[in-house]
Amino acid sequence: MGTIDISYYNLFVGLLLLAIPFFYLWKFKTGLLKPAVIGTLRMIIQLFFIGIYLKYLFLWNNPWINFLWVIVMIFVAGQTALVRTGLKRRILLIPITVGFLCSVILVGLYFIGIVLQLDNIFSAQYFIPIFGILMGNMLSSNVIALNTYYSGLKREQQLYRYLLGNGATRQEAQAPFIKQAIIKSFSPLIANIAVMGLVALPGTMIGQILGGSSPNVSIKYQMMIMVITFTASMLSLMITISLASRRSFDAYGKLLEVSKEAKK
């Protein structure tokens, strides 16, 4: 039995559930009602367009087009990270783009080529969803970690300079701030991994079961999805911080103005 389709009418009926959270956003004057409505409308429009695009992407199944789509995702993720972190373009754009590109290619192709052992590693059926999952998780973890890293450096400038003054290298002086960034970014992911299957069934597993896969196959895919997202997120963060830090300090190790707001 395949996945049951949802008619457009039934989809509309399902969307009516949003009236509940929208009501409480309005009742308590949170200021989030307008962003929530706009965000929902954007989600609907974007997903419909992506659905149309992916239909032809899967139909063509062209390696060059598939890879171009990944490049587009990386570009959009880089721009999104710039907005969410508030860091200057010259500080973050190249480092996070390189971090995303290297991580998604290394980890994604390792999974598709070595673990799944597909004859065509650029098959749209696997290439696009796997790389999309990796990009989404890398973006979230990088934004949280970079915000924590740079806010910590700004807040604890005296500690950073104290470490440098006592003979620490730049890498050693930056290590406590990188540590805090990793803890803040990856603690939720690690907690989620620990209770997976007990507290909640993950989306990938549910999707595969609804699509007709056996639970045994689904759990193995879910295990690997968690492994590759964890690995790719950590690798991309380390690459991004390493490259961004080289642009964030002067010759004497002093933190430069890295935020866009600093220009005001």
Predicted regions and their residues:
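Non-cytoplasmic
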Residues: 191-216, 220, 236
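Transmembrane alpha-helices
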Residues: 173-199
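Structural signature of hydrophobic alpha-helical transmembrane segments
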Residues: 4-17, 60-75
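Short cytoplasmic-facing helical segments at TM-TM junctions of multi-pass membrane proteins
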Residues: 148-181
